[in-house]
UniProtKB/Swiss-Prot annotation:
SUPFAM superfamilies: EGF/Laminin. CDD domains: cc_LAMB4_C, EGF_Lam, SPEC. GO terms for cellular component: extracellular region; laminin complex. Its main location: secreted. It comes from Danio rerio. Residues 267-333, 334-396, 397-448, 449-500, 501-544, 853-900, 901-946, 947-994, 995-1053, 1054-1105, 1106-1162, 1163-1210, 1211-1257 form the Laminin EGF-like domain. Glycans are attached at residues 231, 1001, 1329, 1485, 1496, 1513, 1533, 1599, 1629, 1644, 1672, 1686, 1702, 1726, 1745, 1750, 1761. One of its GO terms (biological process) is axon guidance. This is Laminin subunit beta-4. Keywords: Basement membrane, Cell adhesion, Coiled coil, Disulfide bond, Extracellular matrix, Glycoprotein, Laminin EGF-like domain, Repeat, Secreted, Signal.
Amino acid sequence: MLLRLELSALLLLLIAAPVRLQDECVGNSCYPNLGDLMVGRAAQLAASSTCGLYRPQNYCILGYLENERKCFTCDSRSPYNDYHNPSSHRIENIITTFQPERKMKWWQSENGVHEVSIQLDLEAMFQFSHLILTFKSFRPASMLVERSKDFGRTWKVFRYFAEDCANSFPGISEGPAHSIDDLVCDSRYSGAEPSTEGEVVLKALDPSFDIHDPYDSTIQGLITLTNLRVNFTRLLTLGDTLLTRRKRNPQDKYYYALYEMVVRGSCFCNGHASQCIPVDGARGDTFTEPGMVHGRCVCQHNTAGYNCERCQDFYHDAPWRPGGKADSDVCKRCNCHSHSEKCHFELARYLATGGVSGGVCDDCRNNRIGPQCELCGPFYYQDPQRSVDDPYACIPCDCDLDGSVDRGLCDPVNGQCVCKQNIEGERCDRCKVGFYGFSRDDPSGCQLCRCNFLGTIQVGNPCDPTTGRCICEHFAYGSQCDQCLPGYWGLGNTVYGCIPCDCDIGGALKTECSSVDGQCKCRPNMVGQKCNDPAPGYFLAPLDFYIYEAENAAPLAVISPFIGPPPFVYPTEGIPERPTKLPLCPPAPKPSSVPYREHITVQPSPAPHNPQVTLPMCEHYFRQRGYDFKISNGRLVVVKREKRQTRRRRQGQRTIPFEPGSPLQILLRQRANDQSITWTGLGFVRVQDGAGLRFTVSNIPATLDYYVVVRYEPESTDDWTAIVSILSIGSEDERCPNDQSNKMFTLPASGRTATLDLPVCLSDGNQYHVDITFRKQPSEDPHSSSFILIDSLGLIPKVESVPNFCSQSYLSQFQQYRCIELAVQAGGQTLPEVCEMLIGSMSAFIHNGAVSCNCHHVGAYGSSCSKFGGQCQCKPNVIGRCCDSCAPLTYGLGPNGCSPCDCDRSGSTTELCDQTTGQCSCRDGITGLQCNRCYPGYYGFPLCRRCQCNRLADICDPITGDCLDCREHSAGRNCERCEEGYVGDPVSGQPCEPCLCPDLNGSGRFFAFSCNKDPRSGAPYCECLPGHTGPQCDSCSPGFYGDLRLPGGRCKECCCNNNIDPRDGDACDPVTGECLRCLHNTEGPRCQSCKRGYYGNALAQDCKECSCDRRGTDDSKCPAGSPCFCDQDTGQCPCRPGVQGALCNECDDGYWNMDGDYGCQPCNCNREHALNYICDKITGQCLCQPEYGGRICDECGPNHFGNPDLQCMFCDCNLEGTVHPACDAYTGECLCKPGVTGPFCDECAPGHNNNFPACEPCHACNHLWEKIISDLSLDAERIETMMPCPEDFRSRPELQHLQNLLEKLQNVLNMGAQDELKKLEELLARIRNETEIIDPNIIIIDPTLLLNTDIDYIRLEFNKLLKNLREKAKEGPVTDIKAVNDIFNKIKKFYDEFTDSEKKVEAAKKVQEASRKTREKVTLELAKCQIGEMDKLERKVKALSAANINEEVCGAPGDAECEKAKCGGALCGKCGGPDCTGSLPISLNASKLAEMTEKNITALRSQLKEADAQLRNASEMTSYVKDQAENMMDKINRTKTKYEQEKTDTKALIEKVKTYLQDELVKPEDIEKLANAVLSIQLPKSPDEIKDMIEDIKKILANITEFNDDLEYLEKQAKIAGNMKERAKEILNRTELINVKEIEKALNDTAKLHDKIFNDLDEAEQNNDVIREKVNETEPKLKNIEDHLNLTRAKTLLDEIEALKNKTEMNRAQGKEAKDTADAALNSANDTGKDLEELKEQFEKLKLNSTNQNVSSEANERLKNITMEAENLAKHVEDKMKEIEDLEEKILLSNERKDEMRKELEALQKEADDLKKFIVDKVQRYNLCSP
C-alpha cells in the first residue's frame, strides 16, 4: 500500500512538472540540469580489458610504504562486494556512488596491456560538458578521448593526452588550442606524478574562447554525442621493463586503474525544455536510480521530438531554431483564416516575406487558395462587403467575353477582368488610348494607331478610335504623319514638327535637303550638312583672288633703249587652250644660271599680237629678284633685306628698268617693320605719263560681269586718268557681248584704288588683253611728278550678275557691310563674317565647288590648306600659296625645305643665289658655292693674295697661306726647308739630299727623326729615334731590342713589366727582347710571373715568399731544403688531403691530427652514434650522442652499457656510490666505491656504517660476525635457489626449445659466436652470484625473459653480419690483388694485436687472482683481530692506491674529493692547475716555454740569416739600394706575417689543449699521451745561450747603418703619403714609451691646438654652408639663363654663355670639393679629438707607472714630432679655410657676371619678341598673289 502511494505521488509530480516548466520557458530559452551521465547506465558501460575477469590474476604495486606486501590478487569474476568479493575490479566500479569507503573499489585493467578502451553508450543524443578521470595507478603515458553522434557508427577524437606528444601522436599540434575546434595534444595530465589519484580533465568547450552562438553547427558538433570512448594507448613505465636484473616480471606492476569516471552532461533539448523523461524502451530501473539524467525532452515553445528538434503540427509559420533570448518567433501557429487545419513550412516564402511568415496552408476550402487561404480561387473574387474569414466572401467574375481572355477570368481581389492586349475597362469593353477598331475576332482586341509620334499631336488620342486616322503637327504630312513637307527636315526635333532646310546658296546645288538628316546636295568638293565647307585638300577663293600684278604686265609704249646690264630673259610657256583649267599654282620657271646683279632688267612679253608668250608667275618673279615671302592669315608679305652698295631711290625701294630706254620701271618696295603693307606683289611699276600696261587675263572662272579695279599710289597731288581697252583674243561669246570702245575712269590722288564704273563681261572660255593707258590730268604745279605707281589690276565678280545666286536680303547685307570695298583694298583687312560667308558661297557657285589646294608634295607639310584663301602649310624657307618655291636667299627645294644661300657678303655681288644649285654670284678672284674662298694659288680671303712657295708648290692653305704639296723633298710654310730625312737649303737653291741613318728614308732601315749638318764641319749627322743609338742609329739602346738587319726592323722597348733595370745593357736580350735579369723576385720571358716559391702580382712588383706549413703541404710541392711552391697568383699552398687554409695549416672538417706522418687523417666518426662527421682537430674526438662515447663514438658512453651496435642503456647507478665510469660498459654492473655495495651502489657494504655515501668502516672485529652471518645467509640462499619452483617446471619445455635455437645459432655463427655465447653465459653466472646478496623482498625478473632478451640481441647481431656478408657477396669477385693483400695484412695485424691484448687480459687475470689471494690473506689476518698487522696492511693498501700517483702526476694529494681537489686527479676529469707541482702541469708549462723559446730562436735565426745575406749583398749591389730596400720590406712583412700566424696558431693550439684537458670526458690515458708528446719537445740548452745569440744578432744589425738609412728614408716617404687619420693614430702609438712628466706641457699645448682646430673647423663648416647656399642659388639662375637663350643670337653671345656655364660648373665642383675637404677635415679632427682623449687616458696611466723613469733622447724626439705634426695639421686646416674663402669670392664674381648676362639676354629677348610681333602683323595684312 505504501509503495502504491509513493508511485502515485511520483506520477503526479511528473504530470505537474511540464505545467510548471512551461511557465518557466515562456519567451526564454530553457535547459535541463547537468548530471553525471554514468549514473544508471552500468549496463551501457564497457571496458576492453579488465583484470581477473576470467581467472584470478596477480598484480604488484610501486611505492607501497604502508605495508610490506607489494603484490595482490584481482578476481573480477563476480561483482564487487565489500565483504564477500573486495578484489573485484569491474568497470561499473568507476560510477560515482558517494559511499564512505569509496577508495576501496576501482576498475583495473590486465597487467602490461597498453591499448585499453572504456566506452559509454547512451540511448539518445546528450549534451556533453566535461569528463573527469581519477586514477588509482599512474596516469597513462598516452591516451585519447573519442565521441560519436550516430550511435557508434563513426567516431571523432575529442582530445589527445600524452607525456611526449611528438612521439605518441606525430602530426598532432601541441596545445594550447587557437580556436574551439582545434584538435591538440595535452601533456599536462600524463606525468609520473602523482603516482595515485591523478586526474585527467576534458572540457568540451575551452572557457578561454568567447562563444557567441552556442547552437552553431561547430559548437553542436563538439558538445553533442551518443557515445563516448576513452582509449588508453600506452602505459607509463619507469624504464625497468628492459633491465635484465630482475627475477619477477616487471609488467605485473604496470596497468590502468580508475577510481571513478565522471561524464557531466545533460539531456539535449535545443533550449526548448527544462526537464527530460525516460526514453521509450529504456531500462525499467530509471525510477529507482537517483541522479540519473534521462534522454527524452519535455518540449516547450510548440516544439516536438526527443530533442525538441522540430515544430508541432500546424505550427510552421516560423522556422524551427534552437532556443534563444526571445523565442516568440519560433514555431508559430499557421494562419489559414479558418479555411484549413493543415500547413507546412517553405523557406522561400519565409525569405520573401522578410522573415514574417513561412507557413503554407494545405487543402483550402470555400473556393480559397494562397499560402494562408487568403485569396479567392479562379473565376472568383473577394466580396468587399465580407471579411476574409467568411466562407461566402468569394463571388463569381463578370467580364465581357469579347474583350477578355481565359474565359472571363478576373482578379481575385478587386474583380478586374483580364483584358486582351489592347483592351481596357473593368469589364474589358473598350480600346486603349492609341488603339482603334474593337473586334471579337482580333486576338489583341484593337489595332495600334500607326502614327509617327514625332509628327503627331500628342494631346489625347493620336488617332480616331473608330477609323484610326492620325492628327499631324505643323509641316508634317502623310496618313501616319511620318513625313516633312519639301524644304523641311528633322521630324520631331523641335516643337513645330519639322524645321526648314538651310543649304548654302553657293555650295549646294539646290535649296532642298534630305528630310531625314537635313543633308543638302553639295557641289563638287563641298562638305557639311549645309555644303558650306570645302572638303579636305580644297579651299574657297576670296573676292580679290583674281589679281594681275603690274610687274608681270607688258609695256604699251616702246622707248629707245639705254645702256645697262644685260637683260634677264625668262623662258616662255605656252598658254593652255582652256584657261579655266590652268593650275592655280603652275610649275615654276627654270632659274637662270646667270648670276644675279643689283640692277636687273626684265624683258617683257613680246608685243600684244604675240599671244603665246606670258610673263612668269608672281612668286617666281619675286623669288628670282631676291625677295622673301612670308605668309600670315592667308596673306603674303614680301620682305627685302638691306644690302651693302645698294643704290636707293628712296628708303625701302629700288627700281628695275623694263628694258633699255623704257619709260617703265619696276619699283621694289621694301617692307619696314612698323609699316603696314598697302600693295601686292614685289612692289609697283613706275609709269610715265602717257605710257601704259597690258595685262593678260586667261583664267576667268565663269562668264560674269566683273568690276575692273586698279590699285595705285600717286607721287604727286595730281589726279590721273586711266583709259581701259579690253581686247578678246579668241572668238566673241554670244553670252557676253562687250563694247570695244575705250573706257575711262579717274585715279584720284587721295585714293589708292579706283574702280571702273561699269562692269565688263568676261567669258570663261576666252583670253583677254586689258590695256590701260595712264594720263596725268592738267596741273598748276610745273614741278609735279609725271609718274604714277601702279600696283595691280583686279577683277571683282559682280554679285548681281551671278544668275540665281542670292536673294535681295543677301545683296543688301553684301552692300551694307561694304564687302567689295574691303576686298579690293590691299593690306589684308579682316572681312566681317557676313562678307566671308557670302564671298565663300559665291566662290563655290562660280567655281562649281571648292578649288583644289594643289599643295606641293615636297614643299608642303601636307595636302591640306586654309579653308578661305587656300594657303598651304610650307616647310622652312618655302613660299607660295602652294609651297612650290624657295624663299629669297634660299635654294634647293627638298624634303626639309630650302637651304639658305649664305652668300658671303665679302665675296659675292648679291645675297641671291641660284635656286637649284645654290651658287652665289662671286666677285673677281673669288670662288666657291658661297663665294667664301680664293681661287687655287691664292690665300687670304677676301683679299686673295698669291701663294709664296719658292716655286716648289702650286697651291697653299687658303686661309693661312701655308704651302701645300711641296716638291723636291722640301717642307715648311713656304717650302723653305727640307723634309725629315733630307738635308739642304731650298731658299738658296741648294737641293734637298737624303740622309743615311743608316739607310735612306723609306727604305725600311731609317731610324732617325732627321739629320742635320754640323755647323763647323758641314758633315751630316743623324737625330736618332727613341731606342736607337750610334752615329747612324744602327744599334739599340739599353732596355731596347730589335734585329735591325731585317727589313722593317725597329728597336722596341723591352717588355719586362718594370721588373728590370733599364740602365742595364744586359737586362734583356738585344735581339729577341727576352728579359734576362728580372728583379723583384720575378721570372719569365717578360718578368711577368713571380718566381717559384713566391706569389703575388708581378706586374705591380708585389711578389711575396710562400709561407706554407710543411706539415700540411704536399711533399712534392714543398721539398726539403727549398721553399714551398704555392699558387703564384693567390698564394694558396698545395695542401695534402684533408688539410685546408691558404697556408695548409689547419685540418679540414672531418679530419684531425695535423702532426701526423701523412698530414690530417679522417675522423671516421660513427655515422649512427655521432652527431656529425666533424671531430676535434687535435684529439680526433667525435661529438657523440648522449649515450655513446669513445673517440669515434663506437662505444657506450660514460654511465651507459650495452652493445653499441644495438643499444646503449643508462646504468641507473647511484653516482655518489660509484667510481668513474659508473658501470661496466658491457654488463651494466655498477662499479661501487670501497665500502659501498648494492646493485645500484646506493647503500653501505657490510662492515661499514649506514651513513651513505660516506660509509665509514666499522670496527675491525665486526668483520668476524659479518663473515659468519654472510656465509650462513649465502648458504640459505643457495639452498632456496636449488629448490625448484612450479614456474620452473612450466618453463622447461620453453627452455628446451630455446636451447635448440641456440645450438642452431652456434652452428651459423661458427667459433666466434660460440665464444661470445660462452662469455655471455659466464657473465650471467657472475650476475646471478652478485644478485644472491640482494634483498629477497625486491622483485626478481624471471630468467626466461632475460634469456629471450639475450637471444634477441644475438639474432640482431647475426642479421646484421648476414646483411654485410650478402652486400659483400653482391660486389663480385675481387680483382685488386694488392688491395686484398693490404686487407689481409690489416686483418693479420689486428689479429696480432688482439692476441697481444688477450695475453694482457690473461696476465691481468693472474694479477686479479693474486689480488684475490691477497684479500683472502688480509681477511684471515683480520679474523685474528691482529690490529697491529692490520694497520700495516692498511698502509700497504693505501700505498697501492692512486692517491700517491695523483699527487705525483697532478701536483696534490689525490684522496680528496674532486670538488675540493684543486689539482684534480685520475677520476676528476682534470689534472693540474696554476699552483700545482705535478709532472703533468710542469710538462705543460715546459711545453709552452719550449714552444715560445722555439719561436724566438726561429725568429732570431731567420733574422740573423737575412741580416747576413743583406751584409753580403750590400757591398755588391750598392747601386740597387732602392730595389734591395723594397725586397727587404717585403721579406720583413712576410716574416712578420709568418710569425704572427705562428703566434696565432700556437695560441690556438694552447687553447685547444687547455680545452681538451678541461673536458670531463677525456680519459686519463689520453692525458698521459698528450703529456708524453709535450715532454718529447726539444728545448734549448740554456737561457744564457739564447741571450747571447740575441746580443750577437743585435750587434750585427747595428752595423748595417747605410742600409738602415735608406730603409728609413723610404719608410719616411711612405708615411708622408698617409692621410691625417693615420697620422693621428701614429701619434697615439708613439706615446707608449714616453715619460709623462716632461711632456705634460706639450700635451696641454696640443689640447689647446685641438680646441683651435675645432673652432676653425666650425667656421669652415659655416662657410661651407654659405657656399652650398650660393651654389644652390646659382643653379636656378643658370637654368633661367639657359631658358632665355635664343637661336637668333650671335655666336659670340652663345660662347660667352657657355663659358659662363662652364665657369659655374667649375665653381660648383670647387664648392663640392671644398665641402668634401671640409667634411674630411671635420671627420679627421673628430678622429684626432678622440685620439687625443685616448692620449690623455694613456698619459694618466703612464704617470702612475713611470715615476722613476728617465727621459731619453728618443722620447724628446718623439715629442718634437708630435708637436710638429699637430702644427702641420693646424696649418693644413688654415690653408683649406683660405681656399674656401677664395672660392666664395669667385662664386660672388660669377654671380655678378651672370646677372649682367641675364639682363642682356632679357633685352635681346624683348627685341626678338617685338620683331616677331611686327612680322606677324605684316603677314596678316598681305594676301598671296593669284596664279
